[in-house]
From Swiss-Prot:
The species this protein was found in: Bos taurus (Bovine)
Main localization, broad class: membrane
Subcellular location: Endomembrane system; Late endosome membrane; Cell membrane; Cell projection
Record's bilayer topology term: Multi-pass membrane protein
Protein name: Lysosomal-associated transmembrane protein 4B
Family designation: Belongs to the LAPTM4/LAPTM5 transporter family.
Length: 226
């Protein structure tokens, strides 16, 4: 007979490279934290020196302005929010506080849904890929080579690429979810479940049989004082 904790059942506690889900969630949170910090630094430098990051309409092949002040402020706010969410997930996994992981998990679900929507759009409207490629700047790398590819093959390649991304994102979602369940189980219950190797159980006898057996037993000898 061995003792099994409730939080170790029904799901895996290990993720990629055989590390624990807590370790994987911490590494994932730190990685996202670094990426968003780099993006925030780039946005702040672009806001401080807009001439250095200025792109004209002719360079972009369109009649619109690239990253105006309003869009820049929105992007900075999103980056700050993402840094906060990633920091909360990292802290929650390290300190075993399940509630701190929920915002990061919700972000993963939202990101997965957006990528799924892109895959569905490519599948339903395959001609939209060609239209999007035509709108790219003339000096975009490998634009002519991409345009020369068969449209059906191009759609299949893009769908395969998106499917790989979705599978990887789904795996990361499962790792974070298993970490949440593991921490939530440890914090909410300290009861150990005893698992036996056989199915035998101990049953109490019926009440009538117990009373009859107790009545047929000989009474104890009388007490004699010394």
């Amino acid at each position: 007979m061995k003792m099994v904790a409730p939080w170790t059942r029904f799901y895996s506690n290990s993720c990629c490279l055989c590390c624990h889900v807590r370790t994987g969630t911490i590494l994932l949170g730190v990685w996202y934290l670094i990426l968003n910090a780099v993006v925030l630094l780039i946005l702040l430098s672009a806001l401080a020196d807009p001439d250095h990051y200025h792109f004209s309409s002719s360079e972009l092949g369109g009649d619109f302005e690239f990253m105006d002040d309003a869009n820049m402020c929105i992007a900075i706010a999103i980056s700050v929010l993402m840094i906060l969410i990633c920091a909360m997930a990292t802290y929650g996994a390290y300190k075993q506080r399940a509630a701190w992981i929920i915002p990061f998990f919700c972000y993963q679900i939202f990101d997965f849904a957006l990528n799924t929507l892109v895959a569905v759009t490519v599948l339903v409207y395959p001609n939209s890929i060609q239209e999007y490629i035509r709108q790219l700047p003339p000096d975009f790398p490998y634009k002519d080579d991409i345009m020369s590819v068969n449209p059906t093959c191009l759609v299949l390649i893009i769908l395969l690429f998106i499917s790989i991304i979705l599978a990887f994102k789904g795996y990361l979602i499962s790792c974070v979810w298993n970490c949440y369940r593991y921490i939530n189980g440890r914090n909410s219950s300290d009861v150990l479940v005893y698992v036996t190797s056989n199915d035998s159980t101990v049953l109490l006898p019926p009440y009538d049989d117990a009373t009859v057996n107790s009545a047929t037993k000989e009474p104890p000898p009388p007490y004699v004082s010394a």
